[in-house]
Amino acid sequence: MNIAVNPKDPNTFASSCLDRTVKIWAIGSPVPNFTMDAHEKGVNYVEFYPGADKPYLVTTGDDKTVKVWDYLSKSCVQTMESHTNNVSFAVFHPNLPIIISGSEDGTIKIWNSGTYRLENTLNYGLERVWCVALRREGNEVAVGFDEGSVVLKVRLTGPLLL
């Protein structure tokens, strides 16, 4: 479970909840602006799309899915399925047209953020994947596992990838 501040409106944030919902809040308000029924099981992560052109969120859940939402219309744009266990996180890359997800199945998945097609699956044999950090100025992505961490240099080659 986490919270994410909207980069387009720093007075708005989203929270992911084990009750299967994502709530959108205004800073200072004791009640959410609205609640979205997001996943069939607990929601582990929520993140806003960093660009100005789309009002999107990405969420992950214990239902093994990654979902992209239009938070203005409160509708699911796409459900991405490929992980075989709870999905710990998913983030929009700030500079490249990809979504990066990590799961308790031990894999990192790279998705095309325009077509939502799975582009690559990485498995370093370090057990469950738990957390991610992006270097906004570059294309490095750090991923934390049960048994260590990996720093990836992500770049586009051909149609997409590492």
Question: What do these predicted ranges mean?
Answer:
Residues 15-19, 59-63, 101-105, 144-147:
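Conserved strand-to-loop turn within each blade of WD40 beta-propeller repeats
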Residues 37-43, 80-87, 122-129:
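WD40/WD-repeat beta-propeller blade N-cap
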Residues 4-10, 28-29, 47-54, 70-73, ...:
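Loop/turn segments within WD40 beta-propeller blades
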Residues 1-2, 6-12, 16-28, 34-35:
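Solenoidal tandem-repeat scaffolds enriched in leucines and small polar residues
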Residues 131, 135-161:
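Blade-level signature of beta-propeller repeat domains, shared across WD40, Kelch, NHL, RCC1
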Residues 3, 22-27, 46, 66-69, ...:
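WD40-repeat beta-propellers
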Residues 1, 9-12, 32, 42, ...:
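WD40/WD-repeat beta-propeller blade-loop signature
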